Amino acid sequence: MSLKPLLLLPGLGLVCLLSACAGPLPKADPQQAWIDLAPESPNDLLADSVDGKRLNDGRYFQVSPGQHRLRMALLQGANGNSAQPDCLGRLDYAGFQAGGHYRLVESSQGQDVSAALLDAQGRQVAQSRPFSCL
């Protein structure tokens, strides 16, 4: 008997948690800044923590105006073969505005992985440090 199918269970559970099982996104609070994570990548970029506080929902960040440290996890390939993040990254930004909408976009150049923070007009306002990858 092969154990290979059993190795897929944690990954499948994570995919279920992050997809339809997670429910609809909450409505954005106009007193907070909302940060989407770009879904069009072949990798899954997930929200991990804000200012060191872990998040319950990895699909978005919502922060008060001002300076914050966002921590992200990246599952490369998003093929369900791993429930552990392949890379961890962080982005510091001091200009979050109430009611502002931002988007985090993962970018890879060879082995280097990072994320750019874009404002509502699509302009880059911050860049993460290079991610730490396994």
Task: Map each language-model feature to its residues.
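Short loop/turn and low-complexity linker motifs enriched in small/turn-promoting residues
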Residues: C21-L134
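Sec-dependent bacterial lipoprotein signal peptides
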Residues: M1-A22
